[in-house]
Swiss-Prot record:
Name of the molecule in the record: Nitrogenase-stabilizing/protective protein NifW
Family the entry assigns: Belongs to the NifW family.
Taxonomic source organism: Azospirillum brasilense
Keywords noted in UniProt: Nitrogen fixation
GO biological process, one term: nitrogen fixation
Subunit structure comment from the entry: Homotrimer; associates with NifD.
Biological role: May protect the nitrogenase Fe-Mo protein from oxidative damage.
Keyword Thylakoid applies: no
Alphabetical list of Pfam families matching this protein: NifW (PF03206)
Amino acid sequence: MSFKDDLEDLETAEDFLRFLGVTYEQRVVNVNRLHILQRFQDYLSADTGMEGLDDEGMAARYSAHLERAYQDFVASNAIAEKTFKVHQEEARKMADRFVPLDALLPT
């Protein structure tokens, strides 16, 4: 079986983390599993250098991207990371609502 074939058998965030050798804390995964997988997919999609890699090279690259995605949520949270569209839209709304202090003071 190839690396890609092995990936097709994975179902959960924990499956991916174990298969790719990423050490994780269950509490982080419990809260952020979808966000971690989405960020992992984002990193994979942005990686233009995987074409032509053998299985070992692909596994190393996938592992690095998953480690990075996981670490994003160890150090932060889903809202701050704005992983999903709903979080991105909320951040834009909040930016539109911002009123600088000097705009409130009489001139």
